[in-house]
């Protein structure tokens, strides 16, 4: 009899408590639990780690050397685990040459279509040649006008990453040009006062004197210069001028011959010398990116834009949204001569089968030429998922980490359909998620908990969804079976705008139509809508830049007609990007707790006797850091023929400190004595009890506790935090301040949050609102939307079918709006 389940015995990865669990094979298995309860540790740290490692071990040593390999999971035994693939919560951001079409491989089918089935252009006389099977057969075409023969371009000749690239932009579709408006942002200043910014930041300051020798008055406001003087500043010739250079200390003048660099050339010269991101950042403020003037942003050469199918070229086809492209491709075979239709149908079927799942996952609003780097995390994850389904593999374990991220409730059925397809093909799907609509579709449900961190790591419920719903110990059960309720009191229509308005009017940008919005100040405002409806464009690309510009007295973005937000001095985006670049950044250092602890330990008698000051207690640079791992807590071993092995430092056992640090104790109010390494190994909640008497530390720890982060250890590296944890940690410094001049914007703050964690998040928002802040969230989570004071629903659809404010008002108003797709689910 074949195995029926993956048998996990004695799993101890991260906070897992030596657990035993059987995961049914060939089923859709959901894993639930509060944040930090051990869900990902079980799914990714045990199931995926062991499934992928064992598959790779079956390969040759030569092959394994070229692959990234995982270390053995901390588990006694895992039996019957299939080869595993993981779809992570944060797929990598693709490079500048990647588009939605290349990521999904839809461009491959399109290029083949335009190579084999197009009306090609004769390179000799420019006449169009009817579609012919000669192209597929590798034969030449004969021009009906001039009679000369030529070969049609192959699929590779139509690729913007290969032979079809525009020679001007190299296939990127964009050109960087100097933005003259940014060179002199304040024309009320004189040149001597620094009106021409590049001369003070990218070029020697004495260029002001050279400009004076060029005939430009440098002691009058820039806006009073004559047109010819302005032209010299921006475009003057590179000629040598004799100047007297006086150093800042005023001692002695030195005669110099100096070549004049006009303001535009100063930037162009600096750009040409850029060697890294830091250098580009200095120059970027003076640049604007625009479409390539030769290819118009299509990335394709003129020759690659010549072939036509159904009256359009490849660039025009790629500019379509996926939904429009599907409709267009359906009509291609019928537009061709009868003998070509079978071949065209095969190519079109390949395109349509790949597109079907992308449409099911709600990505039909994306254009094929959309730059891959501009896709959201959820969009990239769904592209990844659709690609996996198309492979039609069998006998594989797929581990999906929160695939519902960024997914509107209207698209959940499509996601479940994709996962069911994988199971129907004979695979096992393990999905870590918090969305109760996704979990309710599982054949088998495992719940981890009961709480986060050290208090979690246990299986508190397992079985079918019905069995988990009846389980007394389950924390997800009430949300699987209960009707949703509103937690926060509803603000009445009469009170909604009591604290003021934020008003804004915009012109069209991307798919967002010209619109006006009115946002109540001092309220929790949710911006909703299906994927691609314009939420991100409205809030992140329009509202935040406009508020920041107005607060700084600068020009608002060109597509913003006007903004009225009197009294708003700060616009803060709290996003889910990881905090810190390496393991040296920890929860304690980011929250300014570690500095206070170092000072406290430096005041102890033992530290004073040894001559240790606060700096000695730094694990990054201090004298007490571990010399073996240099304060990182881990070391990397280079093992030949095997991957580098990252292990806990054997000298400090992960504490980051040398043994000397364990001899310096601080006495608590209860008489207990603790070392700094011991404190750093504690959770926030444990440290609250251990640091009584340290007022600043207590206040900061209490803030983290109130943010729902009490389970995090002080020494936990910040890059390892989930998106939701990172967002809340970034808020730590803002809590407790008066915020009536502030707007806080959260981009999908419920990412990675259990329904119970969403309640904690709502309490955090209440704390900000109580201090006068205006809190704006871009969100799909129905529990959060239901608890907002005010909702702005974008749509009605995605892409060209969206970009409008469908309705705005209380959640009840949205639910009653017949045009709102979000309202149907509320």
Description of each model-found segment:
Residues 1-826:
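Conserved phosphate-binding elements of NTP-dependent enzyme cores
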């Amino acid at each position: 009899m074949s195995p029926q389940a993956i048998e996990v015995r004695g799993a101890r990865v991260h906070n897992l408590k030596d657990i035993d669990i059987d995961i049914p094979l060939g089923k859709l298995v959901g894993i639930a639990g509060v944040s930090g309860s051990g869900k990902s540790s079980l799914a990714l740290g045990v199931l995926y780690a062991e499934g992928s490692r064992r598959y790779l071990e079956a390969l040759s040593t030569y092959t394994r050397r070229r692959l990234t390999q995982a270390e053995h999971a901390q588990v006694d035994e895992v039996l019957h685990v299939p080869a595993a693939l993981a779809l992570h919560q944060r797929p990598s951001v693709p490079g500048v040459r990647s588009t939605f079409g290349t990521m999904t491989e839809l461009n491959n089918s399109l290029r083949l279509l335009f190579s084999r089935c197009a009306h090609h252009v004769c390179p000799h006389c420019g006449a169009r040649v009817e579609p012919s099977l000669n192209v597929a057969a590798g034969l030449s075409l004969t021009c009906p006008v001039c009679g000369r023969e030529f070969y049609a371009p192959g699929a590779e000749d139509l690729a913007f990453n290969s032979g079809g690239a525009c020679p001007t932009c190299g296939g990127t579709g964009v050109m960087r040009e100097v933005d003259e408006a940014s060179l002199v942002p304040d024309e009320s200043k004189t040149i001597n006062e620094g009106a021409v910014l590049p001369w003070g930041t990218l070029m020697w300051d004495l260029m002001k004197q050279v400009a004076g020798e060029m005939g430009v008055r440098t002691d009058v406001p820039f806006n009073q210069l004559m047109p010819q003087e302005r032209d010299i500043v921006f475009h003057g010739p590179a000629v040598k001028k004799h100047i007297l250079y006086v150093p800042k200390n005023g001692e002695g003048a030195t005669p110099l011959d100096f070549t004049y660099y006009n303001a535009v050339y100063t930037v162009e010269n600096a750009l040409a010398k850029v060697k890294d991101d830091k250098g580009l950042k200095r120059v970027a403020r003076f640049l604007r990116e625009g479409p390539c003037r030769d290819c118009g942003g299509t990335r394709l050469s003129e020759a690659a834009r010549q072939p036509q199918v159904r009256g359009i070229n490849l660039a025009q086809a790629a500019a379509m949204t996926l939904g429009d492209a599907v409709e267009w491709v359906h009509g291609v075979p019928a537009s061709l001569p009868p003998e070509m239709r079978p071949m065209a149908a095969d190519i079109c079927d390949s395109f349509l089968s790949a597109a079907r799942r992308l449409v099911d996952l709600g990505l039909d609003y994306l254009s094929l030429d959309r730059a891959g780097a501009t896709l959201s995390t959820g969009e990239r994850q769904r592209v990844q998922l659709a690609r996996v389904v198309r492979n039609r593999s069998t006998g594989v374990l797929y581990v999906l980490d929160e695939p519902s991220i960024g997914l509107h409730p209207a698209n959940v059925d499509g996601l479940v359909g994709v996962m069911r397809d994988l199971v129907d093909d004979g695979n096992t799907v393990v999905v870590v998620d918090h969305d109760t609509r996704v979990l309710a579709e599982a054949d088998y449900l495992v719940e981890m908990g009961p709480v986060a961190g050290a208090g979690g790591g246990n299986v508190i419920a397992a079985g079918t969804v019905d069995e988990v719903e009846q389980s007394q110990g389950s924390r997800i059960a009430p949300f699987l079976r209960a009707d949703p309720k509103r937690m926060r009191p509803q603000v009445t229509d009469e009170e909604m705008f009591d604290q003021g308005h934020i008003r804004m009017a915009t012109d069209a940008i991307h798919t967002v139509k010209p619109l006006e919005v009115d946002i109540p100040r001092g309220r929790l405002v949710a911006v909703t809508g299906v994927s691609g409806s314009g939420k991100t464009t409205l809030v992140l690309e329009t509202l935040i830049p406009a508020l920041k510009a107005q607060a700084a007295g600068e020009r608002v973005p060109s597509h913003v007609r006007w903004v009225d937000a009197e009294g708003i001095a700060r616009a803060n985006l709290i996003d889910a990007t990881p905090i810190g670049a390496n393991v040296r950044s920890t929860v304690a250092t980011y929250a300014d707790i570690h500095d206070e602890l170092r000072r406290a330990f430096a005041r102890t008698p033992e530290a004073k006797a040894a001559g240790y000051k606060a700096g000695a207690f730094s694990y990054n640079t201090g004298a007490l850091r571990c010399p073996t791992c240099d304060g990182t807590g881990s070391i990397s071993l280079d093992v030949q023929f095997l991957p580098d092995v990252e292990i806990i430092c054997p000298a400090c056992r992960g504490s980051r400190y040398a043994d000397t640090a364990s001899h310096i104790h601080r006495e608590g109010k209860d008489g207990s004595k603790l070392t700094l390494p011991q404190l750093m190994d504690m959770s926030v909640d444990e440290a609250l009890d251990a640091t009584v008497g340290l007022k600043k530390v207590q206040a900061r720890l209490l803030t983290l506790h109130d943010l729902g982060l009490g389970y995090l250890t002080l020494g936990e590296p910040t890059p390892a935090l989930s998106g939701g944890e990172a967002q809340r940690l970034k808020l730590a410094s803002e809590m407790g301040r008066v915020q009536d001049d502030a707007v806080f914007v959260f981009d999908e703050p419920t990412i990675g949050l259990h329904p119970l964690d969403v309640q904690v998040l709502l309490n955090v928002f209440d704390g900000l609102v109580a201090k006068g802040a205006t809190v704006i969230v871009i969100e799909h989570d129905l529990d959060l939307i239901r608890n907002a004071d005010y909702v702005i629903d974008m749509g009605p659809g995605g892409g060209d079918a969206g970009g409008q404010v469908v309705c705005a008002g209380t959640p009840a108003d949205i639910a009653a709006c017949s045009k709102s797709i979000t309202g149907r689910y509320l």
